[in-house]
Every structure is written in C-alpha cells, then in structure tokens.
Amino acid sequence: MRALVVSMAVLLASIASIATQAEPRQFTFSWPFEEGDALRPRGGTTRGAALTLATEPSAAWRAVQEAGLSKFERDRRAILAMAGGYRTSFDFLETVGFTPGFQPSRPYQSWGTEYIYVVEDTGAFIRLQHLMVMFVADREGKVQGPFVQKHWRQDWRYEDTDLHVFIGRNRWVRQERTADEARGRWSQAVFQVDDSPRYEALGEWEHYGSYSAWTSERTARPLPRRETTVRDDYQILEGVNRHTLTPTGWVQEEENLKLVLDAQGQPAADMPYLARELGVARYEHLVDFDFSAGDRYWQRSGGFWRDVRAAWDKVYAERDTFEYLEEAGGQEMFVPLFEYADRLDNGEAYDAAAAAEVIRSTFARHLR
C-alpha cells in the first residue's frame, strides 16, 4: 500500500477514525486522591501493529562504551547512538501547582513508531531528522498504514557560540555566548515539523561507564501542540532537558515550568509560574520493523526539505531578531510545505523553481 503522507492534524484524525481504544492507561505517578476520571490521560488512544523490541545492547551503544576515546569522540558517538528505528512513548504530567486553588490539567500520553536519520555529520555538527512511520490496528484488528509524518529535528553543534532563543509572543532573538561558556559543550537546537525553530540550548555530556547523558541549561520554548490545543493561559514552557542513552534506546526527560508573560512580554510580577510539569519520552529500538515508506519519503522529498532548511539558515544569518507566526491567514506554516513534499513522494519530479516559490511565499506569510 502506498504510504499516506499527511499533516499532523490529518494524521491524528485518520488514525482516530480507525482506532481501537487501548487498555486503560496507568497512573503510576499521579494525583492519587483526585476522584473520578478528571485526570484520565488524554492523547493517543490507538493500538499499533505487533512489534518486536530489541533485547540486546545496540552496536551504537557498545561503541560509546569503547575504551580510550576522547571526550569529544564519546560525545559524538552518544549523539549518533540516538539514530535508528524506535517505538516511542510520550508522558507529561503536572506535578506541582503554584496558584491558589490549583487544579492539575489532564496528563498527556501518546505513542508512535519513528526512524531517526543521520542527515549530516561533519564531526563537530550532527543533524538528526525524526520521521514517523505508523501502522495502526482498526476495530477489527486489521492493520492500516503505513502513515508517514515528518516529525521533529535536532541539530547538535560543538562549542556553539551563536544561538537563537525564544523570548515569548512569537519572538526569537540571537544569543551570543562566549568561548568559555561553550567550551566542551554541545548545543542542541530543536525544530518543529516544518523546520521552524522550537528551542536551542547549551549542555554537556557526562559519561560514567555505562551511563551517558546530556543535560541542557534552562531554556524557553513556545507551547507545544499538546498544550495549544487545550489551553492559552500561559506563554512560555521553560525547562531543562536530559537525554540519556540506554543499551536498547534512549530517554528524553523534561522538567518544565509554565510561565505567564505580561503585556510587555516580561514574566508576570504577581504570579509568573502556574505549574511544574515532568515529561518522559522513551525511545525503544525495534527489530524488523518496516520503515521503507519513510525511507522512500525522505529520498524523494529530502532535497526540498534541504532547501527549506537553507531558507531558515538565511533568516538566522541575516536577522538578530524575528517574529514567527505559526498560523497566518487561517493556515499553519507546515501545510503548504507538507503538500509540496507529498507531491514529491507521490512521484512528481522536483522542480527547484516551483519549490523556491512555495518556500518564498510561505515564509513571507509567516515571518516578520
């Protein structure tokens, strides 16, 4: 079956229409005295096709453990060890409230199967692209798919001194760091499905035998889709990320604060923070999963997405500050970009001039 390459909204709607409700999800770490199901987790409710998880340590993980490596090379291998095919799970839970009469929002849980490609590796710079490839069981247990979705991207740069950070109200600014601040550290820049920026921060890898983890500085980011669809009472998700390798995958942990800005774009004086949230995303290596639809999508559309990244690079090089509107004229930025990439995946030849016009017109609507 030809892969269905769709937008995030269409993907979720398509999957929901054929979904079988999963077994009740666990509240292992939650609010035990809340009555009823007001805190029943929201998010994905589908079941995927049968999967086989890896049980033996990966070659990439073993490569990180090799004796005699320089710190730089061990860092690099740890980043590269995040590539590959995974079952992913996402859990987010408010754990502490700072407002009178605080009521925690519903926890969020979801899942996916995705492949992480090494798009670029020049030594001190590594680019990883996530691509979701999902097979979903319908109510009768029949497997539907594959559904293909370009997901997020992470760029890693060694001793980076030129960052772009979010300051709220759709605004981004250049942040220059000193060589001393960057020494021995890696920046991680995270990008959304349309390659627009999400957050960027410096952090340092630590390696102790079988333990390898990178921890970021506190960084601000726009509200994620899982929040913008249900609330608008705060403006910045401010948090610390930790990426930890495991023998059969990796885990991303987040500790986030939900920050309110005043009309001047400053933290609200009386009550800047609403709540603290913990997040855990687990990436578990898969064995013998068919990611070929994702391979084909990336082979056919990768040149277009390279040009999209180049357009963003031009923005970063030329502007110390810019405003990015995720939605403009009733349309989100990813829509025309996904539509053109879908045409390429369906066999249309890449037309550099046509692609350039799609990119130009899209950026003109969404950047200020």
Model-identified regions with their sequence ranges:
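Amphipathic/hydrophobic helical signal segments and adjacent flexible N-terminal regions
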Residues: A22-A81, E94-T99, P104-R106, F125-R127, ...
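Positively charged n-region of N-terminal signal peptides that target proteins for export
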Residues: M1-A3
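Extended serine/threonine-enriched, polar tracts that run as long, contiguous segments within proteins
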Residues: T215-A263, Y273
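Bacterial N-terminal signal peptides
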Residues: S7-I15
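Extended amphipathic alpha-helical segments with heptad-repeat/coiled-coil character used for oligomerization
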Residues: E120-W152, W156, D160-V165
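Short helix-loop boundary/capping segments
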Residues: T178-E238
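Hydrophobic/aromatic beta-strand elements that line small-molecule binding cavities or substrate pockets
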Residues: P104-R106, S110-E120, E238-L245, D270-M271, ...
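A short, structured loop/turn motif at beta-sheet edges
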Residues: L80-G84, V118-A124, R242-W250, H285-D290
